[in-house]
């Protein structure tokens, strides 16, 4: 069953974000975690208590460097257990200045360890593919290393991180995703996330050819303060999937 979510706008009042989701048919929100902190402006601590009491589903999207797996992995697990979550996203990132030929192999080991840790608590782990901006977990070969080492890890495919439809198909051939980040982009731009229809991605081609019969989570990463941009993005994808 397809579930529709969206990345929370952490500069807005949280109750307003929840109400926006309920009015417009979003099933859950994505909340970011970075440097040991759940990201939300003007929210008192502990934030996880407020998210729990709001009684609206969220999924945590953690930005981790290879060092962060050991530094923050246990804290992330603590939060997931408190929220009674059964899924989490880790988006591996690395400053190119701090990366070398061994960095990808370190990521493979870190991912395997944390997937096993979370699995022991009944938590499914998604790892996100990168754009060429990061040069880490970006190529199909990178992803193959990850999933060969840790078959229990699931793929979160960020559509806006592809270089071409061929790149997309090669990733899908490695592992079919069970979760998607959706936004638009121009192929000439290294890293870009736009409302659907503001770039040049052909989502009919993507869903009817490369992701045919997709049945999982769809998270809209539409960086806009304009509600209509988010609503219309969802409507475009629903029309492709359900008409």
PLM features per residue range, with description:
Residues 1-3, 15-22, 69, 77-86, ...:
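Histidine-acidic metal/acid-base catalytic patches
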Residues 1-81, 243:
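N-terminal pre-domain/capping segments
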Residues 7-11, 32-36, 61-65, 93-95, ...:
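Active-site beta-loop-alpha junctions enriched in small/polar residues
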Residues 26, 57, 124, 154, ...:
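Hydrophobic "anchor" residues on beta-strands that sit immediately upstream
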Residues 37-49, 97-111:
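Active-site-adjacent beta->alpha loops and helix N-cap segments on the catalytic face
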Residues 46-61, 110-118, 146-150, 203-211:
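Alpha-helix-loop-beta-strand connector modules within alpha/beta enzyme cores
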Residues 83-101, 126-131:
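Active-site groove signature of glycoside hydrolases
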Residues 105-132, 228, 234-239:
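Catalytic cores of phosphodiester-bond-cleaving enzymes
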């Amino acid at each position: 069953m397809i579930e529709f979510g969206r990345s929370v706008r952490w500069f807005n009042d949280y109750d307003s974000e929840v109400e926006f989701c309920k009015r417009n048919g979003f099933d859950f929100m994505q909340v970011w975690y970075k440097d040991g902190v759940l990201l939300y402006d003007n929210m008192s601590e502990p934030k996880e208590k407020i998210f729990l009491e709001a009684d609206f589903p969220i999924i945590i999207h953690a930005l981790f460097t290879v060092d962060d797996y050991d530094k923050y992995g246990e804290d992330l697990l603590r939060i997931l257990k408190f929220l009674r979550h059964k899924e989490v996203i880790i988006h591996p990132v690395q400053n190119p200045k701090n990366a070398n030929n061994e960095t990808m192999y370190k990521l493979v080991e870190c991912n395997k360890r944390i997937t096993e840790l979370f699995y022991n608590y009944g938590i499914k782990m998604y790892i996100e593919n990168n754009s060429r901006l990061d040069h880490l977990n970006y190529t199909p070969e990178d992803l193959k290393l990850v999933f060969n080492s840790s078959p229990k890890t699931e793929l979160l495919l960020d559509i806006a991180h592809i270089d071409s439809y061929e790149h997309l198909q090669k990733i899908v051939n490695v592992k079919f995703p069970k979760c998607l980040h959706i936004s638009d982009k121009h192929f000439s731009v290294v890293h870009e996330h736009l409302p659907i229809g503001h770039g040049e991605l052909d989502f009919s081609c993507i869903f009817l050819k490369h992701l045919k019969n997709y049945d999982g989570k769809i998270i809209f990463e539409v960086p806009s303060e304009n509600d209509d941009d988010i609503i219309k993005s969802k409507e475009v994808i629903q029309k492709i999937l359900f008409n």
